[in-house]
């Protein structure tokens, strides 16, 4: 389940509004958001196509999924829900 979305563009999942996200990222981002909505734990997202991995250091407790190239969806998980779902450019 998705608890909170941090990135305005990812609200496309709630409102089906694609204007806040690059067109080449929309399809994969929608797949990731649908999978997050259906997940009960971060490990549910450990599919090869998402390249799931936990972050370390000061980002410990945050997980990352690859959208395309250097673009990632990051999130925290608590009580069977994803929080602070964000779209980040890892440059």
Regions found by a protein language model. Give the residues of each.
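Basic, Lys/Arg-enriched alpha-helical interface segments
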Residues: 1-66, 78-91
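Catalytic-pocket segment enriched in acidic/His residues
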Residues: 75
């Amino acid at each position: 389940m998705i608890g909170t979305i941090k990135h305005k563009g990812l609200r496309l999942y709630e409102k089906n509004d694609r204007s806040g996200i690059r067109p080449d990222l929309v399809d994969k981002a929608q797949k990731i958001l649908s999978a997050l909505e259906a997940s009960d734990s971060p490990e549910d997202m450990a599919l090869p196509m998402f390249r799931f991995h936990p972050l370390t250091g000061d980002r410990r407790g945050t997980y990352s999924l690859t959208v395309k190239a250097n673009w990632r969806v990051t999130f925290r998980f608590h009580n069977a829900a994803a929080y602070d779902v964000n779209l980040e450019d890892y440059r």
